[in-house]
Amino acid sequence: MAAPYDVQQVEAYWRHRWETEGVGRVDLDAVDPSDVFVNLVEYPYPSAEGLHVGHVYRYAGVDAYGRYQRMSGTQVFQPIGFDAFGIHTENYALSVGEHPVSLTARTTARFSRQLSRIGCAWDWTRVIDTSRPDYYRWTQWILVRLFEAGLLYRAEAPVIWCPSCLTVLAREQTERDGTVCERCESPVIEKVMTQWFLRMTDYADRLLAGLDDLDWPERAKRLQRQWIGRSEGTEIAFGDLIVFTTRPDTLPAVTFLAVPPGHPAAGGARPHPMTGAEIPVFEADYVVEAYGTGAVMGVPAHDERDRRFAMAQGIATSHAELLDPQAAAAVGAPAVRYRLRDWLISRQRYWGPPIPIIHCAACGPVAVPDDRLPVLLPEIEDFRPAGTGESPLASVHDWVATTCPSCNGPARRETDVSDTFVDSAWYFLRYPSTEFDDRPWDADRTAKVLPVDFYAGGPEHVQRHHLYARFMTMALHDLGLVPFEEPFPRIRIGGLIVKDGAKMSKSRGNVVTPDDYVGTVGADALRCGLLFSAPWEQGGEFTDAAIAGIERFFAKTRRVITGPDREGPHERTLGRSIHAVTDAIERFTFNVAIARLMELLPEVGSADSKRIFVRLLAPFAPHLAEELWHRLGEPFSVHTQPWPQSAASSDDELVDIAVQVDGKLRGSITVPRDASERNTCEVARREVSAVPAVATRVVYVPGRVVNFVTGGR
C-alpha cells in the first residue's frame, strides 16, 4: 500500500523548501552567458481580486517548459512581476470604491500568494511592480531620453476618445475597426487634442523587416505586418487635395472623392487632374484619416465598396478605359504609406507615472532633470477622471506649480500620465537589475542575460504590447542604451481556456479561481488538468472531469512508484516514451506529453524506470515528482536532475501522421512509429480541434494517415 499523501501538506512543504534553498534561482553575476535561459511570461494586471484558471493554464505551460530547460542543462531565469499602473487597475478601484494605492497593495499581495501556490519556479527575489517609485522613476528616465532624442513630442492631432473611460486611447487600444474601446467596449469618438506621442512610424520599415528573423507564430507575424500596413502607391493631386492610391491606373474612372467625417473638404469639389472636371467630395465612414493622406478616390466601376457608396449617394459610374502602366506612373508621385501611426502615450487619468515634462512660458516644454526623478504621483482623495480633457492631477495646484529647470522661472508640470503600455514596453530590461537603484539596468548584466530567450503571451498583445516593446527596444538600441534590437526573438502565444463554451470573465459569471482547486485537489492536479485539456497554443474547454482523471492518474502513479520493483518496461518502450514526452514539450503540446506518461505508467516497474518516470513527470507536477523522488531515496531536488536521455534515434521512433476529416486535411500529429490505431485516434482528437468526438468510421493507414469519416459533405 502506498504511503499516505496529504496533498496540502506535501505541496506546502516542498514550496517552502524550494524557496528557502533557492531552487530555480540563478546567480546572474556568476552564470555563463551561454548557459542562461530567460523564460518569461507576460506579467499580470493585479486588477481583480485574484487570478483565474486561465492565468494558471498559461503559467503552468511556461513553467513546465522552464523546468524542462533547467533539467536539460540551462540556468533558467524565470522572474515575475505586476503591471500595476494603468486603466485596468484604476477602473477596478473605481468599481469597488477603493483608492488605487491601497487596492494595489492588497491585490498584489493576493496575486503573489496565488502565484506561489501554483508551484511555478518564480525568482521571488526580483519581483517588479510598475506602480512603485523605484520602477516608474526609470519609466520617466526613459521618456526623458526619448524626449532629448526627439522621439517623444507633443502635438495637436485628431485622437480617439473613450467617453466611458474618459481618456484618449492609442489606435491599438480599440477594436472592431477602431469603433470601440478594447477595455470597456464602449463606442469611441474622435476629438482634436494636444497629446504626447512617440515617433513609432520612424521605425515602421525596421519593425517590418525584423519580423522575418523572429521565431514567432506565423499568425502573430502576419497580424503585426497587417497592423504596420506598408503600402506602395501613388500620390495624386486633385487641386489642393492629395489622394494616395495603389491603383493609379483607375484614375480616368474616378467619379467622386471620399474623406473622413468632419474633413474640411467635405461637401466641396476638386478638379480632376486629367480632365479638369469638378469631382464632388463626400464624407465616408470607411475613410481612415490616419491612413494614407486621409482622402481616397471613388471608382465605382472597379471597386465594390465604391460602387455601393455611389449607388447610395446617386453618384454616376464611369467606365473609362484604364491607364497603361507607363501612363499610370506619370499621373502622380510614387509614395509609401503606412497604416501604423505614432504611439499616443498620454492619458487623462490618475493612476500612472506623471509624464516628466515641465511647461515654461519662456522655454517651452522642458524635461525634468534626472536628479529630480522620480516625479512622484501625489496621493489624492478624488482620483476620478474629470472628463474635461485634463487629468485629475490638474486640480492639485501645489503639485502642478513648479519652477523651470532651465530658467528658474514659474512653470507648471505636465498633468497627463503615461499609458500602462509604456511601463510594459521595457519591464523585461529591469528584471535582471532590480538591485540597482542608480540605473534602470546594468549594462554588463543586460548584455549577459538578455534578450529574452522565450516569451509567452496572449493573442490580444500581438498588435499592442509586443509591437510597443519591439519599438522601444529598437529606440533604446539606437541611443546606445541596450546591445540588441529585438526583445523577444522567440514567442509563443498561449490559447484561451474557456468555461461553459465562453472566455472567462466576471460579466459572464464563469470565472473559476485556482483557489477553488489548489485548496482541495492541489496545484499539481490543477496544472495537469489544465495542460491535459488541450494543446497549449490552441486552448480548449476546462472541465472538472479532466481534474478527476488527473487525480486517478496521480493515485496510480504513487502506487506504482512507491510499490515493489518489478521488471519493465522494455528499453525500446522507455526510449520511445522519453522521445515522445520530449518532443511534445518542445512543441508545447503538453497534453500529448501527459497522455504519453499515462500510457507509460502501467509498464513502469524497475527502479531505473521509476526514476526516469518521475523526472519526466517533474515539469508538469513538480510537487508530486519531488515527493516521489524523495520517497525513492534520491537526493534533493528532482528539478536539478538531468533530463532523461535515450540512445534510440527519435527519427526512427516517431512519425508524422496526416489527420483528415471526410478526406480533407485538418492537421497533423506526431506519434510513435508503432502506435496503435486507438492511440493515434486519441492523440488526433486531443491535438486537432476539427476532429469529431464521434465518427461513423475511421480509416487508418499506419505511419501515414488517419481519416475520420462523419458521413457529412
PLM feature spans:
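N-terminal, positively charged nucleic-acid-binding surface of large information/translation enzymes
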Residues: M1-P260, P300, A312, M472, ...
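Basic, alpha-helical terminal appendages of large translation-related enzymes
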Residues: M1-S34, V296, A316-L322, V331, ...
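Active-site-adjacent bridging/hinge elements
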Residues: P33-V41, L115-G119, A277-V287, F428-L450, ...
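Structured ligand/cofactor/substrate-binding pocket environments in proteins
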Residues: G54-G66, D83, Y135-W138, R154-A155, ...
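Conserved phosphate-binding loops in nucleotide/dinucleotide-binding enzymes
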Residues: L94-S95, S102-L103, A170-T201, V243-F244, ...
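Helix-rich, typically C-terminal accessory recognition domains appended to large enzymatic cores
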Residues: V144, E148-C165, F238, T245, ...
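Short Cys/His-rich metal-coordination motifs, predominantly Zn2+-binding knuckles/fingers
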Residues: C165, E182-S186, T275, A361-C363, ...
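Amphipathic alpha-helical
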Residues: M200-S231, P252-A266, D371-T403, F613-P642
